[in-house]
């Protein structure tokens, strides 16, 4: 192929991700011209409502898939945490690339750590996952929704609308904003979203030529971890509308997976772990999902607003 076109959201972070993949592809295939097709998704347009109320993860993906289906693009670059658990017919995930830091970051102009915040402090977050963990572990804090791209969220903090905000560390680091991070939340303190920090590349199903060109970008360890995490989310119906997190780590051919399901107000918080062979990550994810279901996860999920 002489030309490859990458479909991407137009936010600064999404464009960084697309440019990163473009640069890697140019290194791998210097004979090939690689372009980026910037697009605005519905998730980028609706900024006054929390993601959990407007449909969740697929909001950042669908327009890119339309471009793929129409042949306007050959691949789409996503943050894996935004990719729905089931792709529509006609598409496949060709690559799960090497992961940036998967943890959540604490950002504040006044405090060094989440545990330093006094009662009544206002914390901004965009996700039910972070909100549920905050409410469960820090019930004395006030949690308020925070939408917009990374720059917008930081601006709202700097304007004094929040005492602190929580963001994905990966996004801040990729944008060169790592200095804004006051501290990183341990996985025990804030279990990340499935796939957080990893990039995924989606293509049209059966496009073997593009799949072969992308193959060197796949990171087997990250892919195994993310597949296990996504299986937990798949079994439990995870989306932006479900307070759920899962994080896997790899050691000596084994996966250690931790995850939780909670009520949004943190009043019920179920957490567990599973371990298994990295060669079958879905089985490890299924084992953790089964443990959470045995604790009563289904009742928690069924009680969530539709």
Swiss-Prot record:
<comment type="pathway">
    <text>Porphyrin-containing compound metabolism; protoporphyrin-IX biosynthesis; coproporphyrinogen-III from 5-aminolevulinate: step 2/4.</text>
</comment>
<dbReference type="GO" id="GO:0004418">
    <property type="term" value="F:hydroxymethylbilane synthase activity"/>
</dbReference>
<keyword id="KW-0808">Transferase</keyword>
<dbReference type="Pfam" id="PF03900">
    <property type="entry name" value="Porphobil_deamC"/>
</dbReference>
<dbReference type="InterPro" id="IPR022419">
    <property type="entry name" value="Porphobilin_deaminase_cofac_BS"/>
</dbReference>
<dbReference type="InterPro" id="IPR022417">
    <property type="entry name" value="Porphobilin_deaminase_N"/>
</dbReference>
<comment type="function">
    <text>Tetrapolymerization of the monopyrrole PBG into the hydroxymethylbilane pre-uroporphyrinogen in several discrete steps.</text>
</comment>
<comment type="similarity">
    <text>Belongs to the HMBS family.</text>
</comment>
<dbReference type="GO" id="GO:0006782">
    <property type="term" value="P:protoporphyrinogen IX biosynthetic process"/>
</dbReference>
<dbReference type="GO" id="GO:0005737">
    <property type="term" value="C:cytoplasm"/>
</dbReference>
<dbReference type="InterPro" id="IPR036803">
    <property type="entry name" value="Porphobilinogen_deaminase_C_sf"/>
</dbReference>
<comment type="subunit">
    <text>Monomer.</text>
</comment>
<dbReference type="InterPro" id="IPR000860">
    <property type="entry name" value="HemC"/>
</dbReference>
<feature type="modified residue" description="S-(dipyrrolylmethanemethyl)cysteine">
    <location>
        <position position="240"/>
    </location>
</feature>
<dbReference type="InterPro" id="IPR022418">
    <property type="entry name" value="Porphobilinogen_deaminase_C"/>
</dbReference>
<keyword id="KW-0627">Porphyrin biosynthesis</keyword>
<protein>
    <recommendedName>
        <fullName>Porphobilinogen deaminase</fullName>
        <ecNumber>2.5.1.61</ecNumber>
    </recommendedName>
</protein>
<dbReference type="Pfam" id="PF01379">
    <property type="entry name" value="Porphobil_deam"/>
</dbReference>
């Amino acid at each position: 192929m002489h030309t490859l076109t990458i479909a991407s959201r137009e936010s600064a972070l999404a464009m960084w991700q697309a440019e990163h993949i473009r640069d890697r592809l140019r290194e791998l295939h210097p004979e090939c011209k690689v372009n980026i097709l910037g697009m605005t998704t519905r998730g980028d347009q609706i900024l006054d409502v929390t993601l959990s109320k407007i449909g969740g993860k697929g909001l950042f993906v669908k327009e890119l898939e339309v471009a793929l289906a129409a042949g306007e693009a050959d691949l789409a670059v996503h943050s894996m945490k935004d990719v729905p658990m089931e792709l529509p017919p006609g598409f496949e995930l060709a690559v799960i690339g090497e992961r940036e830091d998967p943890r959540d970051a604490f950002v504040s102009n006044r405090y060094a750590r989440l545990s330093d915040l006094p009662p009544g402090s206002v914390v901004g977050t965009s996700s039910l996952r972070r909100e549920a963990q905050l409410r469960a572990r820090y019930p004395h804090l006030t949690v308020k929704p925070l939408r917009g791209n990374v720059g917008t969220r930081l601006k709202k903090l700097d304007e004094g609308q929040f005492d602190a905000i929580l963001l994905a560390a990966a996004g801040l680091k990729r944008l060169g904003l790592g200095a804004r991070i006051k501290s990183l939340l341990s996985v025990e303190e804030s279990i990340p979203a499935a796939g957080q920090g990893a990039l995924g590349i989606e293509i049209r199903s059966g496009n073997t030529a593009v799949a072969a060109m992308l193959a060197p970008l796949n990171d087997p360890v990250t892919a195994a971890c993310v597949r296990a995490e996504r299986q937990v989310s798949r079994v439990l119906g995870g989306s932006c509308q479900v307070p759920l997190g899962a994080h896997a780590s790899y050691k000596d051919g084994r996966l250690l997976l931790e995850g939780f399901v909670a009520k949004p107000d943190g009043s019920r918080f179920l957490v567990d772990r599973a371990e298994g062979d990295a060669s079958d990550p879905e089985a490890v994810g299924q084992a953790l999902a089964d443990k959470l279901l045995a604790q009563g996860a289904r009742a928690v999920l069924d009680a969530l607003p539709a």
